[in-house]
Regions:
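Conserved class I S-adenosyl-L-methionine
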Residues: 20-29
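A short SAM/SAH-binding and catalytic strip from SAM-dependent methyltransferases
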Residues: 90-103
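Conserved alpha-helix/loop element of class I SAM-dependent methyltransferases that forms part
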Residues: 2-21
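Conserved beta-strand signature within the Rossmann-like core of class I S-adenosyl-L-methionine
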Residues: 118-126
Length: 160
């Protein structure tokens, strides 16, 4: 039912994805966005699927293997730290994850650490109001909001 309203293929058209990009799908769940993104970035790109749920990570691994996707790396976290190299990521996806986050400061500091200076953060926040999402992002002091449209927000890291 979720895909009926928020079809991943349609949603991904809104995001500036290119072949060769390194992408983090933070709060990847069962890989609804991870797998299509992996196809879009191609073999020269990479997608890090990050989640706190072992079953979600296992589901992504199994689906990626079935689809022959070798550019997906799963990361099971118990906090917000991913251990991905600093300033190495072109794009972070944060899709319908904000409602379950307990420590916004830790999450956004980690995302800021991961992003290249010209990297982007895409936030989709279907279960909270845009005004609340804007408040959360602005309160970090780490990002500049580039665009807000419907439930979507595109954000750039402020310089370090």
């Amino acid at each position: 039912l979720f895909d009926l309203f928020w079809n991943p293929q349609q949603q991904l058209k809104k995001i500036p994805l290119k072949e060769g990009m390194k992408v983090v799908d933070y709060g990847c769940g069962p890989g609804r966005y991870t797998l299509p993104v992996a196809k879009m970035v191609g073999l020269k790109g990479k997608v890090f699927a990050v989640d706190i749920q072992p079953l979600a990570i296992k589901a992504v691994e199994e689906k990626a293997a079935r689809q022959g996707l070798t550019n997906v790396e799963t990361i099971l976290v118990d906090s917000y730290n991913t251990d991905i190299q600093d300033s190495s990521i072109d794009l972070v996806l944060l899709i319908d994850t904000l409602p379950i986050i307990k420590d916004y400061d830790a999450l956004f500091h980690e995302i800021h650490r991961l992003l290249k200076p010209d990297g982007l953060l895409f936030v989709k926040h279907g279960r909270i109001k845009m005004s609340r999402t804007t408040e959360i992002v602005e309160n970090t002091g780490l990002f500049t909001i580039i665009e807000c449209r419907g439930h979507d927000m595109l954000v750039a890291p402020k310089t370090r």
